[in-house]
Amino acid sequence: MHFNNRFRWGLVASLLAGLLACTNNDIDPNAGTSGATPSKGSADFSRYVAIGNSLTAGYADGGLYRESQLNSYPNILAGQFKTVGGGDFIQPLFSEAQANGSGYIKLVQVPDTANPATLLSAIKQVAPGAIRETNSQGNALFTKFSGTNQNLGVPGIKMADLLTIGYGSPAGNPYFERLLPDVDSARSTTYFQYVSNNLAGATFFSCWLGNNDALSYATTGGVTPLTASALFSTNYTAMMNKLTEGGRKGVVIGVPNVTITPYFRTITLSTINRVIKLLSPATPDLPALAIQASDAPQGARASTPTDLFLLSMILNQTELTKFGRTDVGTKVGRYAIDLTNPLPTQYVLDAGEVATLNTRVAEFNTILKTQADAKGLAYVDPNTFLSQIASANGLSQNGITYSSAFLVGGVFSMDGIHLTPAGYALVSNEIIKSINAKYGSTIPQVNPASYHRVLLQQ
């Protein structure tokens, strides 16, 4: 997912008002462990391999870069596995010279809410550091990584893509293309084959796949189809059979309910009205927006609190300037105000689409849990943890309260979907809990306070 380098200043003002500089100086850096002597239980962690998508790769802040890779949950887990006999963990890191990787976004100052002009420089796009060329579609291809790899996370990959020939070609997924040899014969390698080729000697695995089969539907307002459950099941069964060959143990993580993330919960009708006021002070508050909706008999209706406006609506700098105009959209009526000229579906996940998404995610997780149980694997339900994060009181650990709030909640990064280092540490602890419960191990947890949240950077 790519993000514009500027936010509408009115939105950022409303989001960052009250943002305080935080430190962890008052937190015990040794907190978060059980105190039990580390032991491996019935599992063997001597060679760990991680399979998954962007969350596994360490994607954050709208990009993949060296620091985000170093704070990936597999790297955090591998560090804890060393206390129970785990070995070195090799990731496909961008070099220090190309540390910016694919590029990312960062917060460079706390804006002065009394001076909106300062907000124009509050968000900065960091230029990519590892682009070697562009493909025929004009998309960036990254500097190749060669050699041993134990973090097989590929941003953007779906369960539906596991057996797709050409997925790692220059016209395919650039994050996967980066991992394959720079020879023509490698272009037909599927992700399933790549995983198979990197399992030699592996004694333990984690597998977090399936997120993008739901996420791409959600972030496009239902435009991109959901993966069919039958295909999801077929491909996942093949992957599980491969990963558990020879009795290999591991942990499976379920598909999160993405609609609790800031990407879907930050923009409300009240927020939109505040921004419109900044753009046009004479405009009265809108009681609702006119939206395209899958559950509307005529294709459009007034928005309700159960419809979710996407962060992309604000990240598109020109979108809000269209509100009320009659020369954009269908050009029949006022844009986003009259039902004859509704806000396009790609900017809203309507209530009907939310219900469809939730049903499919539940189906996906049933498939994952059934496979984990059948194979005797540890299973993590991420939604138990995320529900705590999204609750009114958030999740308190070691003196810090974490929430799902955008920028200030501590869990989600600048892109509103992927995690901060602290968020990845929290997830790592949930995975460790599940592993310990399943295999009788006593792997120590990490202290999330030792990992940073959204930072102000120069």
Where are these regions (language model features)?
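C-terminal motif of bacterial Sec signal peptides marking the signal peptidase cleavage site
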Residues: 18-21
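Bacterial N-terminal signal peptides that target proteins for export
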Residues: 1-10
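Conserved active-site regions of diverse hydrolases
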Residues: 23-458
